[in-house]
Amino acid sequence: MSEFSLVLDDIQKSYNHGKANEINVLRGASTRIARGEIVGLIAPSGAGKSTLLQIAGLLDTADAGRVEIGGELVTGATDRARTAARRGKVGFVYQFHHLLPEFSAVENIVLPQLAHGVAAGEAEARALDLLGRVGMAARATHRPGELSGGEQQRVAFCRSLANAPALMLADEPTGNLDPATSDTVFDVLMELVRGTGLSALIATHNHELAARMDRVLRLDEGVLVSA
């Protein structure tokens, strides 16, 4: 097993390639995230944080460079292989929870497991375990509309870990919450990541939250540097 959950090597990405208005977003971004490591990612709006996360999470492709997830080289893989790697090895958390409103908290965590071929009983047991880890066991049967913003995001954290990924990618995971709730929910996120032993790359504008991670990277003119 690889010692790295994520390897990005010389990632390059531009838009409007070859045109007068070409925008070079990533100009050779490289990093390695070790198993169990939590890394912060900071940069101004429009600097390419979301683009980098989408490439790392196999939602987009780089123009050049190499991506490995959990020791698997995914650069140049077929669409089917990329989809399998994305579903099985990567968990996503966004600023807005995107929970399915017609399903309960536990069902929102069960569904991605069923899509991955997990038996219903096993999927429910894992979902309840994850909810218990974030203090949401008593709210398992509540739908998203019956939960507070902080509670909704806790469920979203659990859903991202439904299929036991090697890597969590989070894009401003507390950005939609008030400061007090943001701080509490971030503590929950850190405890969940630490408790499950996975790695995480977390983009945030909050430098105080970033400073609580193992290390912090900054996007500087399309290149990753230590902050």
UniProtKB/Swiss-Prot annotation:
Q: Which UniProt keywords apply?
A: ATP-binding, Cell inner membrane, Cell membrane, Membrane, Nucleotide-binding, Translocase, Transport
A single GO CC term for this protein reads: plasma membrane
CDD domains assigned: ABC_MJ0796_LolCDE_FtsE
Which GO BP terms sit in this record? lipoprotein localization to outer membrane; protein localization to outer membrane
Tell me the protein family, please. Belongs to the ABC transporter superfamily. Lipoprotein translocase (TC 3.A.1.125) family.
Under which name does UniProt file this protein?
A: Lipoprotein-releasing system ATP-binding protein LolD
Keyword Cell inner membrane among record annotations: yes
Q: Name the Gene Ontology molecular function terms of this record.
A: ATP binding; ATP hydrolysis activity; transmembrane transporter activity
Where in the cell does this protein reside? Cell inner membrane
Domain ABC transporter, chain residue ranges per copy:
6-227
Q: Which organism does this record belong to?
A: Jannaschia sp. (strain CCS1)
